[in-house]
């Protein structure tokens, strides 16, 4: 298959720092589990708080949202691995790191939902306000890419 898309219902993040909870919610919904962002945050953080998440907390969020063991890879996936995962019908979380003057300056979570091997692109669902689903060049995603919600690169992957 040269292209594949997994239907991922887009949930907008309900708080300014809940991109990770919204992304976990999208993955859970796609895999058949309905859970709220508040439930995810409370499960992971121990309270309902508008706070970002570290990599382990994002992994725990995906595990809770899907009721399946999730795996954290502290880097981008090779394109072939990303397409293999999506071809099984399973979206995955991408951690984007924003940079300013060459230094990390924040991060954001989005969900990969499709690919096209002919064009070398991945489709990404962004939970940030006013964003949606858009296709990006894989090579730019792992180096320096202008995403809908900021400019940075793919630095971690969480999948089930």
Q: Which residue stretches match the model-derived regions?
A:
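Conserved active-site-adjacent core of cysteine acyl-enzyme catalytic domains
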Residues: 28, 39-160
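Active-site nucleophile-adjacent alpha helix/oxyanion-hole segment immediately C-terminal to the catalytic cysteine
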Residues: 2-49
């Amino acid at each position: 298959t040269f292209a594949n898309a997994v239907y991922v219902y887009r949930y907008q993040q309900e708080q300014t720092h809940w991109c990770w909870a919204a992304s976990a919610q999208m993955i859970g919904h796609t895999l058949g589990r309905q859970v709220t962002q508040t439930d995810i945050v409370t499960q992971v953080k121990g309270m309902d708080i508008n706070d970002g998440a570290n990599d382990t907390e994002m992994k725990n969020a995906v595990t809770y949202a899907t009721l399946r063991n999730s795996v954290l890879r502290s880097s981008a996936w090779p394109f072939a691995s990303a397409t293999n995962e999506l071809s099984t019908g399973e979206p995955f979380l991408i951690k984007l790191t924003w940079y300013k003057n060459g230094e990390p300056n924040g991060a954001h979570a989005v969900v990969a939902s499709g690919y096209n091997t002919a064009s070398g692109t991945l489709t990404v669902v962004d939970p940030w306000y006013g964003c949606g689903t858009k296709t990006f060049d894989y090579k730019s995603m792992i180096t320096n890419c202008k995403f809908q919600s900021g400019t940075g690169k793919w630095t971690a992957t969480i999948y089930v």
